[in-house]
């Protein structure tokens, strides 16, 4: 059960809108070394997720942040509904590694996902749209070869095949009172290569290139039947990705040091972007569109230090320069887009985190460990809308700096574990990428029992 407090914008407040449901998810994991033949290792995983979501928006009042309310002309704070959505999600993966001698490894990987959603209105007669289920099937197959003649270097080449089938209702009239079932299927080939080389014993370089595709998610295609509206005509993102990394890892007696730095370049086409749209009457919704081209240049730095299995401290800093790379307003014209070269909105571009953990091993009894962890996250302010539109100071998600504290006690080498966590320790004002305020200080407790050997 979850109360829906806000819409997709902070100024939209709900007082009687809620969502409830349940989920069942059995899973299977199978692993076998030397499967039928020596050198062939197989891993098979599968899970089934059946969940029901009931979106209820039947209030006859509208609210403000002070809790005050006034009658609505028509019931429904966002859109009058009491809708049940039954979602069935099947996932499976197969990974097979075949080693030939010490230098050659072939890997085959296949991921399959099947999704089906059926909707039912609990208020009145179902619409034609609800009579048509929303379905998708994804298949991603990959084959790679790795050459590792020595411990000093290795080289990998790989190919991937992507396929996605989509089916769902589409309106045939502007009044959206008549629907038909439409289907679409897309497929693509991805590929790439990666290599690593030890310049020194503790200094490693990594270089990779990939022609990659990202298939639209279920929410991007079908929405959430409430505040999000999907688009089944979305095209997959495709990008050229280049990564260069240098890492240093060394141990000096009881001291360990790890340092890594990386450069990132991505040239993305058909970038899938979430937008906030005005539905009139002070109501807003989220939609998804393909944005022609986006270019990303960035770097990240990670550092970690450990001492005698007693303390671990580290941090990470990332700078991502994600820019609109669409030059003209429409294809085939010379009119330059106002947002060309501007930073893409709703994306943090400078952020950092750090943490420190202390361990007390064999505390009170051998095999028991007490750990205390402090971590934080810094996020620089970033545009809420395109920098080319409006005042930069007015339309930004503000800078944020949050702190967390976790206490964990493991018993019998981790078979039993008790943990307590305080998120947002100093009760800072935190926001998501669309400036929706997150929860304040919160406390959590968790007990875990491992039943394996």
Give names to the regions the model predicted:
Residues 22-28, 88-94, 137-143, 161, ...:
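Hydrophobic, lipid-facing positions within transmembrane beta-strands of outer-membrane proteins
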């Amino acid at each position: 059960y979850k109360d829906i407090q806000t819409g997709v914008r902070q100024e939209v407040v709900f007082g009687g809108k809620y969502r409830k449901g349940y989920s069942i998810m059995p899973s299977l994991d199978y692993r076998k070394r030397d499967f039928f033949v020596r050198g062939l290792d197989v891993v098979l995983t599968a899970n089934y997720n059946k969940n029901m979501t009931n979106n209820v928006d039947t209030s006859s009042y509208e609210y403000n942040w002070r809790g005050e309310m006034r009658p609505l002309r028509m019931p429904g704070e966002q859109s009058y509904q009491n809708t049940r959505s039954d979602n069935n999600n099947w996932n499976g993966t197969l990974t097979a590694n075949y080693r030939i001698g010490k230098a050659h490894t072939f890997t085959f990987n296949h991921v399959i996902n099947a999704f089906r959603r059926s909707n039912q209105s609990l208020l009145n007669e179902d619409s034609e749209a609800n009579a048509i289920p929303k379905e998708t099937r994804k298949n991603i197959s990959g084959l790679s070869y790795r050459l590792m003649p020595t411990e000093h270097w290795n080289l990998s080449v790989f190919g991937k095949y992507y396929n996605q089938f989509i089916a769902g209702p589409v309106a045939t009239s502007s009044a959206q009172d008549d629907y038909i079932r439409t289907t679409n299927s897309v497929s693509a080939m991805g590929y790439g290569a990666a290599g690593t080389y030890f310049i020194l014993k503790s200094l490693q370089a990594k270089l990779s290139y990939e022609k990659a595709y990202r298939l639209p998610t279920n929410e991007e295609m079908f929405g959430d039947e409430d505040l999000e509206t999907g688009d089944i005509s979305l095209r997959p993102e495709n990008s050229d990705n280049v990564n260069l990394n240098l890492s240093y890892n060394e141990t000096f007696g009881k001291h360990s040091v790890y340092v890594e730095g990386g450069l990132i370049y991505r040239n993305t086409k058909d970038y899938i972007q979430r937008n906030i749209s005005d539905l009139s009457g002070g109501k807003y919704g989220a939609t998804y569109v393909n944005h022609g081209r986006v270019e990303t240049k960035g770097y990240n730095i990670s550092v970690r230090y450990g001492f005698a299995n007693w303390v671990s401290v580290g941090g990470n800093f990332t700078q991502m320069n994600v820019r609109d790379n669409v030059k003209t307003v429409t294809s085939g014209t010379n009119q330059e887009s106002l947002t060309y070269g501007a930073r893409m909105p709703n994306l943090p571009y400078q952020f950092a985190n750090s943490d420190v953990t202390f361990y007390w091993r064999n505390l009170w009894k051998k095999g028991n460990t007490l750990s205390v962890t402090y971590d934080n996250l810094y996020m620089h302010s970033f545009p809420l809308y395109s920098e080319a539109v409006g005042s930069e100071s007015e339309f930004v998600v503000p800078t944020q700096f949050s702190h967390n504290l976790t206490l964990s006690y493991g018993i019998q080498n981790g078979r039993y574990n008790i943990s307590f966590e305080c998120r947002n320790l100093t009760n800072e004002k935190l926001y998501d990428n669309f400036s929706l305020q997150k929860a304040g200080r919160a406390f959590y407790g968790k007990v875990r029992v491992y039943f394996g050997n």
